[in-house]
Amino acid sequence: MLKQVFNQEGLVRRKWRWFFLLVLAAYVLAIVLMCFTPQPNLFKGIQTPHVIAVGRLRFLVVPLNSLWSLPQLSTPLELSWVIGQNVMNVFLLYPLVFMIHCLWKNWHSSSKSLWLGFRISLIIELTQLLLDVLIDANRVFELDDLWTNSLGALLAFYSYRWLHHRLSRCL
């Protein structure tokens, strides 16, 4: 089955390319909805320590805030929220970057993947700030999101590299 989808370079074959591009576009839309939809009071009762409010803007600029804040979390809900949010941030860009590797070979390096993940993450965070200025979307600029999203992009590269290695032995 993989031989039908991928060529010897590990890229998606021409007849599957449209499908991967469609899935990629759908996933970009999902990211837009997840990251830019306003969240007015959706998470009452869940407090993230060290959030700084400047007018309508909210910032969380403490590096590794989740680790330093664990003792301050008082309920299982808060603990699961913080851990779950970090895990989800690692995997937010993973499918996107993995599909990019399957479609275009010019991203095939760990440094390019890491840089791509960081730039996409920074664009997301800055756009959330802009949305807070324009429509009070109740979003938080989180420094940890930058490194967790970038880590997900790096994991996508290594997953792709593993798949490419497996494919090269099969093809």
Annotate each PLM feature.
Residues 85-88, 145-149:
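Alpha-helical transmembrane segments of polytopic membrane proteins
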Residues 2-138, 154-171:
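Bulky hydrophobic segments
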Residues 137-146:
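Non-cytosolic membrane-interface motifs at loop->transmembrane helix junctions
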